[in-house]
Amino acid sequence: PLSGRSYVYQAMRISGAGDITAPIAETRAGKLPQQVISKTAAHGYSSYGNQIGLATTYVREYFHPGFVAKRMELGAVVGAAPKENVVREKPEAGDVIILLGGKTGRDGVGGATGSSKVQTVESVETAGAEVQKGNAIEERKIQRLFRNGDVTRLIKKSNDFGAGGVCVAIGELADGLEIDLDKVPLKYQGLNGTEIAISESQERMAVVVRPEDVDAFVAECNKENIDAVVVATVTEKPNLVMHWNGETIVDLERRFLDTNGVRVVVDAKVVDKDVKLPEERQTSAETLEADTLEVLADLNHASQKGLQTIFDSSVG
């Protein structure tokens, strides 16, 4: 929603776990117990939203053995903004790109691909840096900034930083771009050009503004105590160019990038099309009592009030 200059005012969370009542001793080697994952994920998710001041009005966790191998975490938000405050224009040569928000670190390097890799007992030692470190207060400041119509009307186009970092968030804004990675604010020294370009550190936004609007935009960012620096310019030549440490380390034609790489074809076989919904149950007068007890013992029918009250549903 922030990319669309909207203010987020409502959220929901749907998750999936295995049997959280299973004995700790039955946990697979190299894995965390389901109850630990379920509780920790809920506390982390709710902490972020509660600090921002975001009302989370629907929270539900489903339980199924299939979620042991791959836990489900689904989040969605609703945002809105006055139509006149949302400007959508095509960037032109000479326009500048401002990076605002959090600083860039090694956290999140490879996160987009890492989330789909096979996890092993060594993953906790080798894949920790793929996880981004959130900063809810920084995100709240950006939300406050984007509620200001005088700010959002200066923005021609914007992107938030997700998978791919600078490569994607800035790389998608225009066909021709010249990016100076040395100007990207860092959490600490020692990052090379590749790490700066692909880091998925959170709470960052990239916006396109006219050169004459840079000072006004940066001044508004400073009022909210948000770092904002010019890191790129839009160019006439349709190439994605990145400079670091006095050298050009990337120079790719847009027409090549637009091919989206090698096409992958995968065969798939649907094996469960006739499986009935878990909620669909049949009973009879003879088995009604036993069937009722079975339903009541199912985790999917148990009260989730304890989980739901972790999330603030009235703030905002």
Model-flagged regions — what are they?
Residues 1-316:
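Glycine/proline-enriched, intrinsically flexible loops and inter-domain linkers
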